[in-house]
Amino acid sequence: MHSQIWVVSTLLISIVLIVLTIVKFKFHPFLALLLASFFVGTMMGMGPLDMVNAIESGIGGTLGFLAAVIGLGTILGKMMEVSGAAERIGLTLQRCRWLSADVIMVLVGLICGITLFVEVGVVLLIPLAFSIAKKTNTSLLKLAIPLCTALMAVHCVVPPHPAALYVANKLGADIGSVIVYGLLVGLMASLIGGPLFLKFLGQRLPFKPVPTEFADLKVRDEKTLPSLGATLFTILLPIALMLVKTIAELNMARESGFYTLLEFIGNPITAMFIAVFVAYYVLGIRQHMSMGTMLTHTENGFGSIANILLIIGAGGAFNAILKSSSLADTLAVILSNMHMHPILLAWLVALILHAAVASATVAMMGATAIVAPMLPLYPDISPEIIAIAIGSGAIGCTIVTDSLFWLVKQYCGATLNETFKYYTTATFIASVIALAGTFLLSFII
């Protein structure tokens, strides 16, 4: 049995190792996480074969569920992208006279972000911000920051996004509940971190026109886009199916055949599978796409997820090493003796790791590995709440090490200092508000 000092030192050094290898030596996060896994296993006295077996089971156990859901989610997002469904939502919201332009961008980011990776969402939806900025003579910062803050929020707290799904799965949280809580917290955090924060700045927010190099980017002709009803039905269908499963678990007898049916169709794999074929028809065939064209789009989408699958698999390996060694159990005792609330701890660890490793996904996986061992000591706090707390922490600290920071800077034509002052601050405020919302939820449920 290793001393607590040895355990803490091993964990801290492993985190430093991950940060250094990614930031300093430019290792891929997959390699960095595997290296840290071998390091922890060695320091905790695991045998070589035990380490390899733990890593294999960690990768396989994690991707066995997540690979299918992420793959299906990628198809859904790709169909949203190529059909123009995301633009349809934005154009429809523009007609709501009672909504300000910045609030519209938050809603666009939250709704469309459910099925889009955050960077893809920025690239796909920023032309809408350009269009509104030109029409209303509004600073681009006032539109782009709420959009990107909302996309980041939904990316971190709402399954079926890969990191949020990983956290929910590893903590044993109900995915339907996490979706509902995540949307509530994400909406509140995005509105306060985006529009309200920028309203507070007032005239101190500089006017930024659409950069000349992006002046040609335009929203597609509205006549070519799918209808709003078809778009919303496709986006919300998998979420509705997963929520039906959650409701059934709370209110139905588990022996009934109808309960089994709802459990089946509400499983994330089944729900996403059904949604993909609905998307093929509603956003593809009805938009005059051939099956050959949709196959090409599907294959192109799959090419983009190899990176995230490898990172998530390595995160599962790191988690498995912590559990297989005695580190996880000892860490649970140490953390409980710190007398820090587990929600605050989960948020803080994710926040710090995001700033350090430049990836919200890696930060959330690392935070899960650190926080998960102590959950049995707090039976009154649901795993769904801890999942939201981890995601809330990962929203913040979008700084120069994060690719999203540079996307915002480039598209807004902002200086480095301006991007720090307005976008980094917006994500940090959103993160703090999300933490407050998580605490509030913990008192209610």
Question: For each predicted feature, which ranges?
Answer:
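Hydrophobic alpha-helical transmembrane segments
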Residues: V8-I13, L31-L34, A67, D102-L107, ...
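C-terminal transmembrane helix pair
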Residues: G186, P342-I445
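Hydrophobic mid-bilayer segments of alpha-helices in multi-pass membrane transport proteins
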Residues: V7-V19, K26-M46, A67-L72, A230-L243, ...
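Alpha-helical transmembrane segments of multi-pass membrane proteins
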Residues: L99-I114, N137-C156, D174-L191, P342-H354, ...
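Structural signature of hydrophobic alpha-helical transmembrane segments
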Residues: H2-L11, T62-G71, F117-G121, L184-L187, ...
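Long, contiguous bundles of hydrophobic transmembrane helices that form the permeation core
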Residues: H2-I5, V180-T296
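Membrane-embedded alpha-helical segments and adjacent helix-loop junctions characteristic
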Residues: P48-K135, H288-L375
